[in-house]
Amino acid sequence: MAKGVRLIITLECTECRSNPAKRSAGVSRYTTTKNRRNTTARLELNKFCPHCNKHTVHKEIK
């Protein structure tokens, strides 16, 4: 059976991993889909992080 074109990916906050002095413990993660033919590189989006209490860059993780 062939693989589908759309993948479910996870986006993780980059500042939560590196900053121990934040508002609350934990790491912000979002799930979304991407088209593997149109977007072959790792996805980076600016999303709100409730742990940092601000908008930060969220990068795609495996």
From Swiss-Prot:
For this protein, the record's Pfam families field holds: Ribosomal_L33
Cellular component terms (Gene Ontology) = cytoplasm; ribonucleoprotein complex; ribosome
Q: Which UniProt keywords apply?
A: Ribonucleoprotein, Ribosomal protein
> Out of the domains of life, which is the source?
Bacteria
MF terms from GO for this chain are: structural constituent of ribosome
One of this protein's GO BP terms?
translation
Sorted alphabetically, which InterPro entries does this protein's record hold?
Ribosomal_bL33 (IPR001705), Ribosomal_bL33_CS (IPR018264), Ribosomal_bL33_sf (IPR038584), Ribosomal_zn-bd (IPR011332)
What family does this belong to?
A: Belongs to the bacterial ribosomal protein bL33 family.
PANTHER family reported in the protein's UniProt record: 50S RIBOSOMAL PROTEIN L33, CHLOROPLASTIC (PTHR43168), LARGE RIBOSOMAL SUBUNIT PROTEIN BL33C (PTHR43168:SF2)
State the name under which the record lists this protein. Large ribosomal subunit protein bL33
Organism equals: Cyanothece sp. (strain PCC 7425 / ATCC 29141)
Gene of this entry: rpmG
